[in-house]
Amino acid sequence: MAPAQQRPTVKIAPNNPVFDLPVIVGIEEGLFARAGLDVSFSATYADREKDSAERPIMARLKEQMFDCGSADSYNVCEWASIDRLERGKRGGNIAALRASVAAQAILSFDDALQVPRDLADVPVMVQELTGSHYTTVQMLESAVGAEHVKIEKGGLPQMRYAALKNRATRAIAVMEPFISLGLKDGAHIIAASFYRGGEVISPDLTPEERKAYYDAENQAVDMINADFYKYAHHITAHAKGALEPRELLRAFVHYKHVDYYDPTLFNRAYDWMKARGLSEGQSQHAALVVG
């Protein structure tokens, strides 16, 4: 193993821990170091707490750090990975579909809201232009019609869950650990949808560095799948003590090796975005995606 000062440095801007778990495990277990890389986070999860619903999209922590060059990579939902590269000034690529396969679930404590059709004209709190937003539109537009899908802008998932628990909103979309926490607290699921994310990377990373990084991340996935609850505390830490690691359900997140973002999947996502005014549609797969 090369000394740290001789290894290429890869800085990761943090997303939610449920999405970052393979990176966390890869660092913790020394997998990146053994692959010849010096991988670390460019900020803490506490730093992410400063993001708010009012903050412009490209001023959010991970986007801002990547765009200014303080981070070499971050993950975000599939649709947002396209959006952020189109909005950003730095340039970059989508190198893979991320290892985390997670659900967004629409939760409520309101007995009047039981199935997706009950959400016609009912605001669902999401974080704008993130997985919670895109999947909520997808879950509801076939049930109630696009004109009856109502989106309420909220902040990070813990903020949305607090709003739900305080009855400041009737329905929210969240991922783990807030799905498990919501069920523990007596909320119910109205709808849920699994989705992948995109790994946004700097154009400065070489193909060899990318391969070493994702090979190590895939090893981390294997370790997570072999002993999920050894690492579950990293996810439940997001709930600030309200959920024990063993209370985290296995049903709403799993992990697999990263995949190439092929043109068919890209075009389906991109066409969906264009049809809803979520992209001007000026990009091509070959311009945004590397493999």
Where are these regions (language model features)?
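Pocket-lining segment of extracytoplasmic ligand-binding domains
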Residues: 151-238
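Solvent-exposed, acidic/flexible segments
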Residues: 12, 16, 59, 99, ...
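C-terminal segment of N-terminal export signals and the immediately downstream linker at the start
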Residues: 2-4, 208
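Structured segments of extracytoplasmic/periplasmic soluble domains
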Residues: 29, 65, 84, 122, ...
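Periplasmic-binding protein-like
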Residues: 13, 18-21, 98-109, 183-217, ...
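Short linear loop/turn motifs
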Residues: 38-50, 248-257, 283-291
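Secondary-structure end/capping motifs
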Residues: 207-280
